[in-house]
Amino acid sequence: MPAATTSIFYLPDINIAPWLESPTSPSGQQVVDQVRKACTSTGFFQLTGHGLSQDVVEDIFAASAKFFALPKDVKQGLNFTKNLGFRGYELIGAQVYESDVLPDLKEGFLAGIDLPFEDMRVQNKRFFAGQNVWPPPDVLPYAEFREPVEKYYKSIMQLCFTVMDLVAATLPYGPDVFDEWKSHEPACPLRLLHYPPTPAHVAGKTRQLGSSAHTDFGALTLLLQDSHEGLEVLNHDTGDWVLVPPKPGAFVVNIADMMTMVTVGEYKSSKHRVINRNETEDRYSVVFFMDGNVDYKLRRLDKIGQPIGDDEDLLTVEDYMLGKRNSTYVK
């Protein structure tokens, strides 16, 4: 592995346009250096210059707001725990990451790659393998929800693969080091999230958060925030929570647990949380998780084929993700 970088709290804004235009140019290499520094410190950065249409971004936020405004019974009819592949509506309080706090004050909607029912991954109930579910079109027309979600999913998948290639460029293992991880219609959940206004008597307390403190489980995450603050990253050196301010058109990118595993801790997966401190307004975010090819084996990048830790057999993406999912959702 490359030599470890001294840990500092570094959460930069990075314009990747120079790298997209000319990866080997001095300005392109400067982007690579910035991303590497972010990956080895907090694992977080704000990404701009990505080229994803602002119309697509605005449409996904509008679609999300319309969905979460639906009657409770309509949303509960799409309960993700009753659908193959964990697709559909996630109830408020369905998840909690910490043992000493109340379940999270958020609701969600999950979608992904649509696989036909006959696909053996669906039949065998593999991780996140299934078909998307949608509100009835007479309740929420496809043009107002399904189509914007599907369009956004296609766009964000392409951007995610670009970011994976950029992260690969920060490592000494070649540009194709993550190709297998990205292959075979990877498990990449798209999660629309709604954080209701937080009552004044709750906003200053930590017993119930919008999203309790956690690290993400996959390879990396791409997050869109609306204009409302809420996302905070833990500074491990000081114990302080640092606000990640919303920036129009920017994606928050963060390294997740499996990337930390394969880089043997060099690339950091930092704890973060969400508190909607607004007492009157809703907060929305759109999260894309790059979990990857469910059969991909989580091997050290510098020692291909050797197990991580003391395991006799290498964990797969599916092994790791199922364990994490089962431990964070309220039974």
Curated annotation (Swiss-Prot):
<keyword id="KW-0560">Oxidoreductase</keyword>
<dbReference type="InterPro" id="IPR027443">
    <property type="entry name" value="IPNS-like_sf"/>
</dbReference>
<feature type="binding site">
    <location>
        <position position="272"/>
    </location>
    <ligand>
        <name>Fe cation</name>
    </ligand>
</feature>
<dbReference type="Pfam" id="PF14226">
    <property type="entry name" value="DIOX_N"/>
</dbReference>
<dbReference type="InterPro" id="IPR050231">
    <property type="entry name" value="Iron_ascorbate_oxido_reductase"/>
</dbReference>
<dbReference type="InterPro" id="IPR044861">
    <property type="entry name" value="IPNS-like_FE2OG_OXY"/>
</dbReference>
<protein>
    <recommendedName>
        <fullName>2-oxoglutarate-dependent dioxygenase</fullName>
        <ecNumber>1.14.-.-</ecNumber>
    </recommendedName>
</protein>
<comment type="pathway">
    <text>Mycotoxin biosynthesis.</text>
</comment>
<comment type="similarity">
    <text>Belongs to the iron/ascorbate-dependent oxidoreductase family.</text>
</comment>
<feature type="domain" description="Fe2OG dioxygenase">
    <location>
        <begin position="186"/>
        <end position="292"/>
    </location>
</feature>
<dbReference type="GO" id="GO:0051213">
    <property type="term" value="F:dioxygenase activity"/>
</dbReference>
<keyword id="KW-0223">Dioxygenase</keyword>
<dbReference type="GO" id="GO:0044283">
    <property type="term" value="P:small molecule biosynthetic process"/>
</dbReference>
<keyword id="KW-0408">Iron</keyword>
<feature type="binding site">
    <location>
        <position position="214"/>
    </location>
    <ligand>
        <name>Fe cation</name>
    </ligand>
</feature>
<dbReference type="InterPro" id="IPR026992">
    <property type="entry name" value="DIOX_N"/>
</dbReference>
<comment type="function">
    <text>2-oxoglutarate-dependent dioxygenase; part of the gene cluster that mediates the biosynthesis of the selective antifungal agent ascochitine, an o-quinone methide that plays a possible protective role against other microbial competitors in nature and is considered to be important for pathogenicity of legume-associated Didymella species. The pathway probably begins with the synthesis of a keto-aldehyde intermediate by the ascochitine non-reducing polyketide synthase pksAC from successive condensations of 4 malonyl-CoA units, presumably with a simple acetyl-CoA starter unit.</text>
</comment>
<keyword id="KW-0479">Metal-binding</keyword>
<keyword id="KW-0843">Virulence</keyword>
<feature type="binding site">
    <location>
        <position position="216"/>
    </location>
    <ligand>
        <name>Fe cation</name>
    </ligand>
</feature>
<dbReference type="Pfam" id="PF03171">
    <property type="entry name" value="2OG-FeII_Oxy"/>
</dbReference>
<dbReference type="GO" id="GO:0046872">
    <property type="term" value="F:metal ion binding"/>
</dbReference>
<feature type="binding site">
    <location>
        <position position="283"/>
    </location>
    <ligand>
        <name>2-oxoglutarate</name>
    </ligand>
</feature>
<dbReference type="InterPro" id="IPR005123">
    <property type="entry name" value="Oxoglu/Fe-dep_dioxygenase_dom"/>
</dbReference>
